């Protein structure tokens, strides 16, 4: 598939957008006694995905009247497209309390967001060597990625939000009697844009088609193909992530528009549109 928290590494990854002079830097001394002034609009930035977990943190903020009025600390998973991290936590699937934490991830994220709105400057969230903070009561998770993403977002300036509602979206086709696979599509939307894509499938045994191929069980190269199925579908995912639309397709659902792709891909683009019906 293409496109942090309690198990991030101590060393924070670099943020994606950070000019040398920033509004955030200009207000780095603000701890709430002064009002930070930012241009009104929507602010969004990410940091690099965590290599172990696949979670890619982002900060999404709204500035009104020169002040941060809304803050969203969230993440999407580059290895397993679908629900955003808050939703995973809200559904009880992230399991911090089960692991001994005092509260779930989304509850701690909400406290960090409220602190940022109060202080108006991500630099007010002081960090220790492990990327944690003592500045926010009830927050034990690593907050480095949130701070870095928020700083990068404020540095980059307002951005235009995309057309879709944020969240995870899923669609699946019918079981193919000949192949024994049913196509599946999972998309993640953040700041209104598609940020993660997974084109895969499932068989009667519940196997994930991409993983089935990664494990060497699908056997396309053994059958004479130039690449394995998961390698080809990754190129299709990248195309969709960049273009947001289907390429020109043959009557068989194949395409010459994506180099190195010989598999049938038409159904995935149809299912992607179906999945996004819930995002409009």
Stretches found by the model and what they are:
Residues 171:
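Active-site rim loops that border cofactor/substrate pockets in soluble metabolic enzymes
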Residues 2-29:
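Bacterial lipoprotein signal-peptidase II cleavage site
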